[in-house]
Design a protein with these regions (language model features):
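Active-site mouth of glycoside hydrolases
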Residues: 1-170, 179-180, 203, 207-211, ...
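Short, conserved loop/helix-junction motifs that constitute active-site signature segments
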Residues: 164-165, 190-194
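Charged/polar, solvent-exposed surface patches and flexible loops
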Residues: 59, 102-103, 187, 191, ...
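Substrate-binding cleft of secreted/luminal carbohydrate-active enzymes
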Residues: 173-178, 182, 196-271
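Low-complexity, intrinsically disordered/propeptide-like segments
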Residues: 20-23, 189, 258
Length: 272
């Protein structure tokens, strides 16, 4: 609602969600600080400078972690979806480019002000991790990142550099291989094999067909410890009942692949 003042109704909804996850045997990857719809971002938040913005983000995560601390349904806290930093020139907007009407990518700073990118990233990660750990010492923390090594050959991990990601529990990276470039994606994935468990946190046949994505998943098993993908709240059976359409066919194939190839779980996160 305001800096340092969490929205109590939203926290109550989170409690309901967590309880539902416990009852249905689901694990939650709680990804925070999303500003996907620019028009819904509070004006006061958008106007904050870096120091106050980080402070507010820390308050946010402390409130979330307090709610989730005792639940076995929490898989992890993901600090922010695809955070980025400015270049040499000062940026003017916290949100990066729009894609499909949404802003998935967000800056954690507008100006490096003489700092290295590693210094800024480490300070941000450490501040938010500390806020979570004051409330929850149990659950894992990660940051879902864009695999820049796929776009810029030779690029090294930023948030998972040794001096930056020390307090992150596992690597989360997002991959959408292009048609004919599965081997390139696998090579880029290897860059993020830094000695921590590695999860491909996002994937979907967005830029290639399902057979190529399936090959990427199979061959990435040499490096990755887990995979998660998109689920928009509709079951496989609901898509099967739809009138034929490209969207329904794509989602039907995807959910069928994921269900068929997902390993069986040995237990569910039910609260005792």
């Amino acid at each position: 609602d305001a800096p340092g003042q969490p929205n109590t109704k939203a926290l109550a909804q989170l409690k309901r969600l967590i309880r539902l996850a416990e009852e249905t045997g689901l694990y939650l990857n709680l990804t925070g600080l999303g500003c996907y719809h620019k028009k819904e971002v509070p004006a006061w938040y958008h106007k904050l400078g870096e120091t106050d913005r980080w402070k507010t983000q820390a308050h946010f995560w402390a409130a979330i972690a307090k709610v989730g601390a005792d639940s076995p349904a929490i898989f992890c806290y993901d600090l922010m979806n695809e955070p980025i930093l400015p270049g040499k020139k000062k940026a003017t907007d916290w949100l990066a480019g729009e894609f499909g009407g949404k802003h998935f990518v967000q800056r954690i700073a507008l100006d490096l002000t003489g700092r290295t990118r590693q210094q800024v990233a480490k300070a941000w990660v450490d501040k938010l991790v500390a806020a979570i750990r004051r409330q929850d010492q149990r659950h894992m923390i990660t940051v879902g990142v864009i695999p820049w090594a796929l776009t810029f050959p030779g690029a090294k991990p930023l948030f998972y550099a040794p001096e930056v990601g020390e307090k992150l529990d596992f690597v989360s990276v997002h991959f959408y291989p292009k048609t004919g470039e599965v081997d390139k994606a696998l090579k880029a994935l290897a860059v993020y094999d830094v000695g921590k468990p590695l999860v491909i946190e996002e994937m979907f046949p967005l830029k290639c067909g399902l057979p190529e994505l399936a090959r990427f998943v199979t061959q990435s098993a040499k490096t990755a410890d887990g995979w998660t993908g998109f689920y928009w709240g509709r079951t496989l059976e609901e898509y099967q009942a739809d009138k034929p359409s490209l969207k329904s066919a794509l989602m039907l194939q995807w959910l069928d692949y994921f269900r068929t190839n997902a390993p069986a779980r040995s237990q569910s996160p039910r609260k005792q």
